[in-house]
């Protein structure tokens, strides 16, 4: 039985180009130059960064215009400019089919330069730009590499719920979930059933607690899931809806194991991307060993700096974005693990590492600041003097044959912004960014 085959993509074409091959490609005209006797059009299909130059006759290109979606059949030939180090191949068009055109002078994605701020106002159309395509391919291949890394370490990918009855981080920055117009729904008219579920429900800020339950049955687990935080933040690092990679490991007994896992994961991703011909100027530095220091050492180093701080570093206070970036960009010029934070500024589930500290770690990276955070988790019931009442189920994990364990969470959008460099805003690393005061489509 003949099976329908998807058309050849430019990505597959560039992997194995053959001079003289008859091919058919689909894509969009990214630029066009019409001369007296010939026309040159650059066509891209979004599957790779490299477009294909199409050579046509003036007659063939009469209706061809910028932005048109096309199918072009022809012969692949060695380009006349190949010896100059330019594109090696070009397509000599024999047949052109135009699917759609842009016949509106008000089309916002013109050939002129548009700032990221302007493009952010039209997220449904900015996806057509070369820069956004490059970022989302980087995101896709990064996620693929992350999954390959965890598979190589015998992790199980899981899907914990995104509707939850608790605030894992305890910060209170949650979105409450309620059905629309519940007063019209007869099932909610009884006094004893005021909620769709039997209690208040929220969009999750972290799947960590559910992952811990999974880890205590599957040993090593991870998820790549959406998370939601109702933060009143207008920074280049914050989103209301974002994606988190979270991992939990049973029988983890030291922070060194956790930091090694985090460092190995990101370096594996970098190496995988470079094998696929991705590269950014700052990546080579990232493959060198990273710095690890305690929170107390970080405060000591920052306090010794002769600088006017917006928020002076003080033991017992959290590190600000200014402190984080100064540590990794100025003092050490490399990613920095900061460990053993004061217990009073960290969530209830973190294991003690001293009289006033917990076995927590934050990974700080240049341009972004905090990229990931994790900890060893409390693993004995008597360690929980106080806890939210809705988390009685979580205490059952300690009650019934618990094991030492730890884990971390990493923001995907921050990771892509970090990999992309050039102080990329996280709003450029997700297709339809949601942030305070801004939602589109």
Swiss-Prot record:
Biological process annotations from GO: asparaginyl-tRNA aminoacylation; mitochondrial translation
Keyword Ligase: yes
Localization (cell): Mitochondrion
Transmembrane segments: none
GO CC, alphabetical: mitochondrial matrix; mitochondrion
Catalysed reactions listed for this entry: tRNA(Asn) + L-asparagine + ATP = L-asparaginyl-tRNA(Asn) + AMP + diphosphate + H(+)
Coiled-coil annotated spans: none
Pfam families xref list: tRNA-synt_2 (PF00152), tRNA_anti-codon (PF01336)
Molecular functions per Gene Ontology: asparagine-tRNA ligase activity; ATP binding; tRNA binding
Top-level EC class as recorded in UniProt: ligase
Domain of life: Eukaryota
EC number: 6.1.1.22
UniProt KW keywords: Aminoacyl-tRNA synthetase, ATP-binding, Ligase, Mitochondrion, Nucleotide-binding, Protein biosynthesis
Entry's family note: Belongs to the class-II aminoacyl-tRNA synthetase family.
Name assigned to this protein: Asparagine--tRNA ligase, mitochondrial
Organism: Schizosaccharomyces pombe (strain 972 / ATCC 24843)
Organism lineage: Eukaryota, Fungi, Dikarya, Ascomycota, Taphrinomycotina
């Amino acid at each position: 039985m003949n099976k329908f085959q998807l058309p050849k993509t430019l990505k597959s074409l560039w992997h194995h180009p053959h001079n003289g091959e008859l091919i058919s490609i689909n894509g969009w005209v990214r630029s066009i130059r019409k001369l007296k006797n010939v026309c040159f059009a650059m066509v891209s299909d979004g599957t790779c960064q490299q477009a294909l130059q199409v050579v046509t006759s003036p007659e063939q290109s009469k209706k061809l215009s910028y932005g048109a979606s096309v199918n072009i059949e022809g012969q692949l030939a060695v380009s006349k400019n190949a010896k100059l180090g330019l594109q090696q191949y070009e397509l000599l068009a024999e047949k052109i089919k135009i699917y759609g055109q842009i016949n509106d002078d008000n089309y916002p994605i013109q050939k002129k330069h548009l700032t990221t701020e302007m493009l952010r106002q039209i997220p449904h159309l900015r996806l057509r730009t070369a820069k956004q395509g490059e970022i989302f391919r980087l995101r896709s291949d990064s996620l693929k590499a992350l999954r390959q890394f965890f598979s190589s370490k015998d992790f199980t990918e899981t899907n914990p719920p995104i509707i939850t009855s608790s605030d894992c981080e305890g910060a209170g920055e949650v979105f409450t979930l309620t059905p629309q117009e519940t007063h019209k729904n007869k099932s909610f008219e009884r006094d004893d059933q005021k909620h769709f579920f039997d209690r208040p429900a929220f969009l999750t800020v972290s799947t960590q607690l559910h992952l811990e339950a999974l880890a205590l049955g599957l040993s090593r687990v991870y998820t790549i899931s959406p998370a939601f935080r109702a933060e009143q933040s207008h920074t280049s690092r914050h989103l209301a809806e974002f994606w988190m990679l979270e991992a939990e490991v049973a029988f983890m007994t030291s922070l060194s194991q956790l930091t090694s896992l985090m460092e190995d994961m990101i370096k594996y991703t970098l190496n995988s991307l470079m094998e696929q011909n991705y590269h950014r100027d700052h990546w080579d530095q990232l493959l060198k060993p990273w710095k690890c220091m305690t929170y107390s050492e970080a405060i000591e180093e920052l306090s010794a700096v002769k600088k006017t701080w917006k928020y002076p570093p003080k033991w017992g206070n959290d590190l600000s974005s200014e402190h984080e970036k100064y540590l990794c960009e100025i003092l050490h010029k490399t990613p920095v693990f900061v460990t053993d934070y004061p217990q009073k500024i960290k969530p209830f589930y973190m294991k003690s590492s001293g009289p006033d500290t917990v076995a927590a770690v934050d990974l700080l990276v240049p341009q972004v600041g905090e990229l990931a955070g994790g900890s060893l988790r409390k693993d004995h019931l008597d360690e929980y003097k106080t806890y939210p009442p809705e988390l009685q189920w979580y205490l059952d994990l300690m009650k019934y044959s618990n094991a030492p364990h730890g884990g971390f969470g990493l923001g995907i959008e921050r990771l892509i912004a970090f990999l992309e460099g050039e102080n990329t805003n996280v709003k450029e690393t997700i297709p339809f960014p949601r942030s305070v005061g801004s939602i589109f489509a």
